Regions:
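A conserved acidic beta->alpha catalytic loop
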Residues: 41-50
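Short beta-strand-to-loop acidic/aromatic patch adjacent to the donor-nucleotide binding site
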Residues: 93-105
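A recurrent flexible, glycine/aromatic-enriched loop bordering the glycosyltransferase active site
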Residues: 139-158, 218-223
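Non-catalytic, C-terminal membrane-associated alpha-helical segments of glycosyltransferases
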Residues: 214-314
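Active-site nucleotide-sugar/metal-binding loop of Leloir-type enzymes
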Residues: 79-96
Length: 325
């Protein structure tokens, strides 16, 4: 039997008093603990820091870093906070590094099983589980984006050699750092995969109303910023007509996508990145039109888990009694 692999975790947290305790308990309950977990409190103004400090003596692998400098709150800032956490890892021996959002929980064997996947495939460079999102009704449902080729930034684990080859996570103003990491890893010859047998529970209820439309507009700008191929983008949005907010949501995201063209926005990725991404998307389109393989070809496929699951079916999805104490 091979020796357990060393891994480290980094979390960027901002005003997460409602969730951070649950996430810490879930990580601390893993059958294989991380060598170090750096939690970066990014200018939090609530009790996030206080809650984290309560766990420091009990779990010596946790480190707390606080950012005091005020700055704009966007997806790029989140990645910069994660980079601040990396500064605490320079003297730690590890083979894998993972981002963990501060509102997640896991099964106790999540990381040991995920590392086993890496052990079985030496060319697997980036991987993670399938994300289940909690709605306002308390029900966890598989997110629409769950496919084997879509690993959300919230749970991305990267082999160290792969991480160094791709230059880590890149700060993207409209999000998409997970997408950039996935594509760049493949550009360097690494395999990527999300595993449906490794559920991850996201406890923050998904937004609605105006916030949902703002997010869709931002996602359209994100699609432009990474250089998505326009025909691919249009087909992807047509397929999303059937998901709330029906029809209108696709038009809002398309508006965001076209906004970048209208304003001649510069993309924060290289020309080589855009060329590689568009080759992959054109290949996906050919598969669709020649073979009709939409689920396997498009990155945001419909849910592979049609039946919702409830939090009480999974012990790791329950918040500890004292996490808000």
């Amino acid at each position: 039997m091979s020796e357990p692999k060393n891994y480290v975790l980094v979390t960027a947290a901002y005003n997460e008093e409602a969730h951070i305790g649950r996430t810490i308990e879930s990580i601390a309950g893993q059958t294989l603990l991380p060598q170090r977990w750096v939690i970066v409190s990014d200018c939090s103004t609530d009790r996030t820091d206080e809650i984290i400090r309560r766990y420091l003596a009990k779990y010596p692998f946790i480190r707390l870093v606080r950012i005091e400098e005020k700055h704009a709150r966007n997806f790029g800032a989140q990645v910069m906070a994660i980079h601040r956490g990396f500064e605490q890892l320079s003297e730690v021996d590890y083979e894998f590094i993972a981002n963990v959002d501060s509102d997640l929980s896991f099964e106790p064997t999540y990381y040991s099983k995920l590392l086993q996947k890496f052990e079985e495939d030496p060319k697997l460079g980036l991987a993670g589980g399938f994300i289940f999102e909690q709605g306002h009704d308390g029900v966890f449902r598989s997110r629409v984006l769950n496919t084997e080729k879509s690993i959300g930034h919230a749970v991305q684990m990267v082999r160290r050699e792969c991480y160094e080859a791709i230059g880590g996570w890149v700060a993207m103003p409209y999000g998409g750092q997970d997408w950039v990491a996935l594509v760049t890893a493949q550009m360097h010859g690494w395999r990527i995969k999300a595993f449906s047998d490794l559920p991850v529970y996201h406890h923050r209820p998904t937004g609605g109303g105006d916030r949902r439309f703002r997010n869709l507009f931002r996602e359209g700008r994100m699609d432009y910023s990474v250089g998505s191929y326009p025909p691919f983008e249009i087909l992807k949005l047509v397929r999303r007509f059937v998901f709330p907010p029906y029809l209108l949501g696709s038009f809002v995201r398309l508006w965001g996508f076209l906004w970048g063209y209208w304003h001649f926005e510069r993309r924060p990725v290289s020309r080589e990145f855009v060329q590689f991404l568009r080759r992959e998307q054109k290949s996906a389109l050919r598969k669709i039109f020649l073979h009709g393989k939409t689920k396997e070809s498009l990155p945001d496929s419909s849910s592979l888990y049609p039946e919702p699951v409830r939090a009480d079916e999974f012990p790791s999805a329950k918040p500890p009694a004292n996490h808000n104490a």
